[in-house]
Amino acid sequence: MTKQPEDWLDDVPGDDVEDEDDEIIWVSKSEIKRDAEELKRLGAELVDLGKNALDKIPLDTDLRDAIELAQRIKKEGRRRQLQLIGKMLRNRDVDPIRQALDKLKNRHNQQVALFHKLEQIRDRLIDDGDDAVAEVLNLWPDADRQQLRSLIRNAKKEKEGNKPPKSARLIFQYLRELAENEG
């Protein structure tokens, strides 16, 4: 009796063991490319950071050296260096790097939001006067009422005389000091 083509498959050596636990997960080529692009973008974000911010991110020495080199390189060499950084990131656990980067971005966003809030309070102090001073004293009991009122009076005079807003800047600086001392 001759073997049929289907029977030939049964005689393959080493095919006797069937491991159901070893399931193969197929990943499309497009998904691999998307992941590589995402890591390259992460590398570009790291390259755009300053030295102080880069020190706050957990990086090994090889990756840090590659990032510092990319910061010094211009044009086409930089593009190639970013590709190398992306390749290096593929072999590393990027979750701690992403978390540290998100933490830096979040801190920056909080600082920007605080500045906007302080600018609104400053503008309200200049426009509303004593009512706004009472609110500031409720927010920051350590605030000096006399100094605030003096700065507000000067800011109003500067605004009416179309002079540079020196006192308005001083009010903002004073409010920022109060906010920093509070937190």
From Swiss-Prot:
GO terms for molecular function: ribosome binding; rRNA binding. Keywords: Cytoplasm, Ribosome biogenesis, RNA-binding, rRNA-binding. GO terms for biological process: assembly of large subunit precursor of preribosome. It is found in: Cytoplasm. The keyword Lipid metabolism does not apply. It holds the Pfam family DarP. It comes from the Bacteria. SUPFAM superfamilies: PSPTO4464-like (SSF158710). CDD domains: YjgA-like (cd16331). Belongs to the DarP family. Member of a network of 50S ribosomal subunit biogenesis factors which assembles along the 30S-50S interface, preventing incorrect 23S rRNA structures from forming. Promotes peptidyl transferase center (PTC) maturation. NCBIfam families: PRK05255.1-1. This is Dual-action ribosomal maturation protein DarP.
